[in-house]
């Protein structure tokens, strides 16, 4: 099977491999669920 080059399937989460809800901004490349788990370790602050 050929590697995907375009579309949502081409971008995968670095942590779990999911293709849904991937955050690409600033080169994060994590799905939103994984991002919520590791955001504080990455230096993001959580506000109310």
UniProtKB/Swiss-Prot annotation:
Binds 1 zinc ion per subunit. Gene3D superfamilies: 30s Ribosomal Protein S14, Chain N (4.10.830.10). GO terms for biological process: cytoplasmic translation. InterPro entries: Ribosomal_uS14 (IPR001209), Ribosomal_uS14_arc (IPR023676), Ribosomal_uS14_CS (IPR018271), RIbosomal_uS14_euk_arc (IPR039744), Ribosomal_uS14_sf (IPR043140). Its cofactor is Zn(2+). PROSITE patterns: RIBOSOMAL_S14 (PS00527). It comes from the Archaea. Belongs to the universal ribosomal protein uS14 family. Zinc-binding uS14 subfamily. Binds 16S rRNA, required for the assembly of 30S particles. PANTHER family: 40S RIBOSOMAL PROTEIN S29 (PTHR12010:SF2). This is Small ribosomal subunit protein uS14. The gene is rps14.
